[in-house]
């Protein structure tokens, strides 16, 4: 799940 988010939204 986190991987998919980081794909277009880099971790703050």
From Swiss-Prot:
Its main location: plastid. It is found in: Plastid, Chloroplast thylakoid. Keywords: Chloroplast, Plastid, Thylakoid. GO terms for cellular component: chloroplast thylakoid. On the 2D-gel the determined pI of this protein is: 6.5, its MW is: 24.1 kDa. This is Unknown protein from spot 111 of 2D-PAGE of thylakoid. It comes from Pisum sativum.
